[in-house]
Amino acid sequence: MPAEMKSAASGSDPRSSGERDKALNLVLGQIERNFGKGSIMRLGDASRMRVETISTGALTLDLALGGGYPKGRVVEIYGPESSGKTTLTLHAIAEVQKRGGVAAFVDAEHALDPVYAASLGVDVENLLVSQPDTGEMALEIVDQLVRSAAVDIVVIDSVAALTPRAEIEGEMGDLAVGSQARLMSQAMRKITGNIGKSGCTVIFLNQLRLKIGVTYGNPETTTGGNALKFYASVRLDIRRIQTLKKGTEEFGIRAKVKVAKNKVAPPFRIAEFDILFGRGISTLGCLLDLAEETGVVIRKGAWYSYEGDNIGQGRDNTITWMEENPEAAITIEQLVRQKLTEGSEVKANSMKPLAAAARTAAAAAPKATADEAAA
């Protein structure tokens, strides 16, 4: 059998390996000349193999997400009213600003409270804020901010408030079926590529609606059509599960977040944390929950103990002790991260889904977090 027929029968290319490499390098060079450097590359040549993240401000949620909000991706946070959606994004903005980053808030609902934002650690003096008149204006502003590659995080509050220009200019009662969905679909096609290139994290807040005529299954859906669901790398479903009280006085809520979609880490994890009125996410509360689950802090009855010494009776008193002893809290955080890196089992129902993602999350989280806190 001739050599050519043998090659064809075996399915191999008759050209030598050197010729194939030369042809490949030639076409790669041609593509880069036509479309710019970085338009095509080997995955192993990429400068960042692991997706960088932004802390959410809640250690339990960071673990559930595999480190935090991914950079250069679209994130959607949805849930009922007063469930903590805006609080989550303000904490993310504060974390970005702590590291010298630039943040923008597109306030389509015209409801941003600068006093509350400042109480959560947001540098309101340097926060970029836009209150657009139309949905088109809002999304065009987002696109220009992303294209600049000078902004680290952009928050849009909310998709439901992105009203198309035609609807605003029309009369009350005029039908505009599907106009917002078309607007979002066009915008996502346009800005998603730029988001990836710039490394900017774009977070959309969204509201819930009920589908009519659903007898079986979940009747809830989000506004703005299906485009955002597809383009988002992370989707978070946040719910208020408990109201926190001291006597008859309400001072916060217990929130539960389900990772409904995650393209950069295992999905369907669940995290719980406290949101205190006027103060935001209780970071020490998150730390205490994980410290108890990993065995760093032991609870017997109502008493919590650390290294054999009782540190507080009841959860609130223990958190107060941690506030008064910041060095001990830093040490506890270091021990918790070490335990999670080693793959410690997490026993409580609220934390079970985090155990399997612990190693991934600890590896993706910034290694200097505890050291920076100590400094």
Curated annotation (Swiss-Prot):
<dbReference type="GO" id="GO:0003684">
    <property type="term" value="F:damaged DNA binding"/>
</dbReference>
<comment type="function">
    <text>Can catalyze the hydrolysis of ATP in the presence of single-stranded DNA, the ATP-dependent uptake of single-stranded DNA by duplex DNA, and the ATP-dependent hybridization of homologous single-stranded DNAs. It interacts with LexA causing its activation and leading to its autocatalytic cleavage.</text>
</comment>
<keyword id="KW-0067">ATP-binding</keyword>
<feature type="binding site">
    <location>
        <begin position="79"/>
        <end position="86"/>
    </location>
    <ligand>
        <name>ATP</name>
    </ligand>
</feature>
<dbReference type="GO" id="GO:0006310">
    <property type="term" value="P:DNA recombination"/>
</dbReference>
<dbReference type="GO" id="GO:0006281">
    <property type="term" value="P:DNA repair"/>
</dbReference>
<dbReference type="InterPro" id="IPR049261">
    <property type="entry name" value="RecA-like_C"/>
</dbReference>
<comment type="similarity">
    <text>Belongs to the RecA family.</text>
</comment>
<dbReference type="Pfam" id="PF21096">
    <property type="entry name" value="RecA_C"/>
</dbReference>
<dbReference type="Pfam" id="PF00154">
    <property type="entry name" value="RecA"/>
</dbReference>
<dbReference type="InterPro" id="IPR020584">
    <property type="entry name" value="DNA_recomb/repair_RecA_CS"/>
</dbReference>
<dbReference type="GO" id="GO:0005524">
    <property type="term" value="F:ATP binding"/>
</dbReference>
<keyword id="KW-0234">DNA repair</keyword>
<feature type="region of interest" description="Disordered">
    <location>
        <begin position="1"/>
        <end position="20"/>
    </location>
</feature>
<dbReference type="GO" id="GO:0009432">
    <property type="term" value="P:SOS response"/>
</dbReference>
<keyword id="KW-0238">DNA-binding</keyword>
<dbReference type="InterPro" id="IPR023400">
    <property type="entry name" value="RecA_C_sf"/>
</dbReference>
<keyword id="KW-0742">SOS response</keyword>
<keyword id="KW-0963">Cytoplasm</keyword>
<keyword id="KW-0547">Nucleotide-binding</keyword>
<dbReference type="GO" id="GO:0005829">
    <property type="term" value="C:cytosol"/>
</dbReference>
<dbReference type="InterPro" id="IPR027417">
    <property type="entry name" value="P-loop_NTPase"/>
</dbReference>
<dbReference type="InterPro" id="IPR013765">
    <property type="entry name" value="DNA_recomb/repair_RecA"/>
</dbReference>
<dbReference type="GO" id="GO:0140664">
    <property type="term" value="F:ATP-dependent DNA damage sensor activity"/>
</dbReference>
<protein>
    <recommendedName>
        <fullName>Protein RecA</fullName>
    </recommendedName>
</protein>
<dbReference type="InterPro" id="IPR003593">
    <property type="entry name" value="AAA+_ATPase"/>
</dbReference>
<dbReference type="InterPro" id="IPR020588">
    <property type="entry name" value="RecA_ATP-bd"/>
</dbReference>
<dbReference type="InterPro" id="IPR049428">
    <property type="entry name" value="RecA-like_N"/>
</dbReference>
<keyword id="KW-0227">DNA damage</keyword>
<dbReference type="GO" id="GO:0003697">
    <property type="term" value="F:single-stranded DNA binding"/>
</dbReference>
<dbReference type="GO" id="GO:0016887">
    <property type="term" value="F:ATP hydrolysis activity"/>
</dbReference>
<dbReference type="InterPro" id="IPR020587">
    <property type="entry name" value="RecA_monomer-monomer_interface"/>
</dbReference>
<keyword id="KW-0233">DNA recombination</keyword>
